[in-house]
């Protein structure tokens, strides 16, 4: 039984119990409940107990069916919300989504991607050393380039999302992540380069 129905049904159950106790003889009452149920005679009191139990059972079943129906109606909406959150960048307008996918493809395959990883490498090399920067600089070149491309894609999909991303949307998102970027200088550099690449999409 759903937890929110317990508080509603308990007063009714107590009312039926008091009513039943008042209609049975005083000899059948004991100081404690028996381990086995007492045999009921074929009296009006016995028939009243039986009918009351049936009413209780039918009363319990109705809210349960209603609750399951409501949950089944809500379930598709909840699933839709989860799917939207799972993949950043999928909520953009069709035009922005096409431009974003095209840009990410160039980051991985075209000369734009080569220029990007070289710029990121030089900026990370010139910055003050941190554990993250040292880890990147010590990577093998092909692994490092792929790592920087993946980081850039993540920032692109983070910055370009919503029904239609505008400049003020980016500014708001930047303010949200600013404290994190102040502690992670490498992430700040990658985010800045990602923004340079995506600025034309936002300003369209």
UniProtKB/Swiss-Prot annotation:
Low complexity composition-biased segments: 25-34
UniProt entry tagged with the keyword tRNA-binding: no
Keywords recorded for this protein, A-Z: Host-virus interaction, Inhibition of host innate immune response by virus, Inhibition of host interferon signaling pathway by virus, Inhibition of host STAT1 by virus, Inhibition of host STAT2 by virus, Interferon antiviral system evasion, Viral immunoevasion
Stretch list, region Disordered: 1-78
Basic and acidic residues composition-biased segments: 10-20
GO terms for biological process, alphabetical: symbiont-mediated suppression of host innate immune response; symbiont-mediated suppression of host JAK-STAT cascade via inhibition of STAT1 activity; symbiont-mediated suppression of host JAK-STAT cascade via inhibition of STAT2 activity; symbiont-mediated suppression of host type I interferon-mediated signaling pathway
Entry keyword annotation includes Methyltransferase: no
InterPro entries recorded: Paramyxo_C
Domain of life: Viruses
Similarity annotation: Belongs to the respirovirus protein C family.
Protein name: Protein C
Organism: Human parainfluenza 1 virus (strain C39) (HPIV-1)
Lineage, broadest ranks: Viruses, Riboviria, Orthornavirae, Negarnaviricota, Haploviricotina
Name of the gene encoding the protein in the UniProt record: P/V/C
